[in-house]
């Protein structure tokens, strides 16, 4: 009842996997899973690098937008 803590639970799970997929298919599945994880980690790393570079451009855009909005407000107040 405590979950998958017993070695026998894992043996049964392994046997079911072998019966479902066959012994020849398991290495292919493991290889596909490994390459999927590798691609996922690479994508996360690339996104983190882009995020480090991105705030510089966003800050500049925010400053320009605030300056534009404040000039519009002043022109409306003068009218």
UniProtKB/Swiss-Prot annotation:
Q: What is this protein called?
A: Sec-independent protein translocase protein TatA
> Is Transport among the key words of this record?
yes
Q: Where is the composition biased (Basic and acidic residues)?
A: 66-79
Q: Which GO terms describe its molecular function?
A: protein transmembrane transporter activity
Q: Which UniProt keywords apply?
A: Cell inner membrane, Cell membrane, Membrane, Protein transport, Translocation, Transmembrane, Transmembrane helix, Transport
Disulfide topology: none
According to its UniProt entry, one GO biological process term is: protein transport by the Tat complex
Q: How does it assemble?
A: The Tat system comprises two distinct complexes: a TatABC complex, containing multiple copies of TatA, TatB and TatC subunits, and a separate TatA complex, containing only TatA subunits. Substrates initially bind to the TatABC complex, which probably triggers association of the separate TatA complex to form the active translocon.
């Amino acid at each position: 009842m405590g979950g998958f803590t017993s070695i026998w639970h894992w043996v049964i799970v392994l046997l079911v996997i072998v019966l479902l997929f066959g012994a020849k298919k398991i290495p292919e599945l493991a290889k596909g899973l490994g390459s999927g994880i590798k691609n996922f980690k690479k994508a996360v790393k690339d996104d983190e690098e882009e995020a480090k570079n991105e705030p510089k451009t966003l800050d500049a855009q925010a400053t320009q937008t605030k300056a534009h909005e404040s000039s519009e407000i002043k022109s409306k107040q003068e009218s």
